[in-house]
Amino acid sequence: IIPPQTAGRIAIDSGLAEGDWCPVKPESFQSTKAEHVYVLGDAAIAIDMPKSAYSAHSQAIRVADHIVADLEGKTVGDASYRNTCWSLLAPDDAIKIGADYTPGRLPGNREGLVASNAFVSKPGEPAEERKATFDEAFAWYPTLISEIFAKDNARAGAAKGRS
C-alpha cells in the first residue's frame, strides 16, 4: 500500500500548502506562507532535491541552524544540502545516486535547489566498489542515529546549553 503522497493534513489545513506540498525558501526551508514556520522532508517543495530520508536529515540540520541563529539574533552562512540514495541489489552489492544542492535558479527562472557534484553508480563497477557502496548504505543509519542521540553531539550540546 502506498500512502497518499502529500504534505500532512495539519500542514494543508493550516494553509501552509500550495496544492499538495508546502513551498519553502530554499536557503532555509522556512515556509513562504508563515513566518517562523519551517517545513522539511516529504512535505516541502524542495525543487529539485529528492524526497528521501537523507535529504530530510540534511534539511533538518539547516533548519536547526536557522532556528538557533534566529533565537540568538545571528545569521547563517550560505546554504548547502546533500542527498544520497542507495539501492541494495544483493548481499554485498549496492548502487547509489546523489548530489549536492544549493539555492539557485532553475529552468524557467524558478527558484529552487540546483544540483552539483552529482554521482551515480556505473554499470560494470568492480565487485569491491559495489561492496563498499553496500557497506556505506548500512553505515548511514547508525551514523544518523548516533548524530541525533549522542551525548557528545556538539549540536545537541549547544542546544542544551541554551535552555
Which positions does each model-derived feature cover?
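Glycine-rich beta-alpha junction loops
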Residues: 3-6, 89-93
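A conserved FAD-binding loop/helix module that cradles the flavin
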Residues: 43-83, 87-89, 96-98
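Broad hydrophobic/π-residue packing in well-ordered secondary structure
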Residues: 1-2, 34-38, 62, 70, ...
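FAD-binding beta-loop-beta segment adjacent to the flavin cofactor pocket
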Residues: 20-38, 90-111
